[in-house]
């Protein structure tokens, strides 16, 4: 028999419920073969930052930055991954996206993607191997962020340094795996800035869907300005991303 879906709540659920609007959560697809795994170790909070995991790459340059073309930005999909969340029987109970934030295997995603998992399998573009892990390095249910780790050298995406203020109307590109469609790329603009439950969020129009959670929202310089976290079904292209300020905390 097919397993009952498990509802995952993102930080924006409370705000959305107040507006009687449905917030997108990751799909809970199918089944996969049973895989033996150890129990997931106790997770840390985002405040428990160790010296090893706190070095998120910030793009620093003394020269004038140049905007990238959409084609160049699409190539950054190689640093965005597809995450499948498995239960103790090896069944897939959810899917989402994640971004590489460190060369030593660190992947940032939404906490609502990683929560409830016994282990995780990660797919990387142009790599036929599927990487499994039980390592949740840190997580925070308030900011809806989590970091998992795989045993592979990665090519991280730089995080926006915040030196120039983001503005409405600014072009953005979203990369993720909506409905499991691996590393889809879409474009749009920043349509607003929201503070939901004391968490800074970016409202944007680039289309996302179930499975996009944890994916990258980039500026035109190829820097991560946010992490896709939710969208409202009843509104056209009303999507939310966790702001870069929370990523750097």
Model-derived features with residue positions:
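C-terminal cap/linker of serine protease catalytic domains
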Residues: 56-60, 65-73, 155-156, 178, ...
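Catalytic nucleophile loop of clan PA
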Residues: 99, 207-228
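Residues located in well-ordered beta-strands
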Residues: 97-99, 133-135, 184-189, 216
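Short beta->alpha transition motifs characteristic of CBS
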Residues: 102, 110-115, 176, 186, ...
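Hydrophobic beta-strand signal
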Residues: 82, 102, 108, 173, ...
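N-terminal activation segment of mature serine protease catalytic domains
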Residues: 6-7, 11, 17-100, 106-110, ...
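Short, compositionally biased
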Residues: 185-197, 242-243
């Amino acid at each position: 028999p097919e397993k009952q879906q498990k509802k995952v709540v993102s930080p924006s659920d409370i705000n959305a419920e107040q507006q009687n609007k449905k917030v997108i959560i990751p799909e809970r697809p199918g089944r996969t073969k049973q895989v033996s795994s150890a129990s997931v170790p106790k997770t840390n909070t985002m405040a428990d930052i160790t010296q090893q995991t706190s070095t998120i790459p910030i793009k620093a340059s003394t020269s004038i930055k140049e905007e990238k073309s959409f084609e160049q930005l699409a190539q950054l999909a190689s640093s965005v991954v597809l995450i499948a969340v498995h239960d103790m029987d090896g069944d897939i109970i959810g899917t989402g996206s994640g971004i590489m934030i460190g060369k030593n295997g660190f992947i940032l995603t939404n906490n609502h993607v990683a929560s409830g998992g016994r282990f995780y399998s990660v797919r990387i573009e142009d790599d036929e191997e599927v990487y499994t892990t039980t390592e949740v390095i840190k997580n925070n249910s308030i900011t809806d962020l989590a970091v998992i780790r795989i045993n592979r050298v990665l090519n991280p995406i730089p995080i926006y340094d915040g030196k120039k203020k983001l503005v409405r109307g600014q072009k953005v590109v979203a990369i993720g795996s909506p409905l499991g469609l691996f590393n889809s790329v879409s474009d749009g603009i920043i349509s607003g800035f929201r503070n939901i439950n004391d968490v800074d969020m970016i409202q944007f129009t680039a289309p996302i869907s179930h499975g996009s959670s944890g994916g990258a929202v980039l500026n035109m310089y190829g820097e991560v300005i946010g992490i896709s976290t939710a969208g409202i079904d009843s509104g056209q292209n009303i999507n939310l991303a966790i702001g870069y300020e929370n990523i750097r905390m």
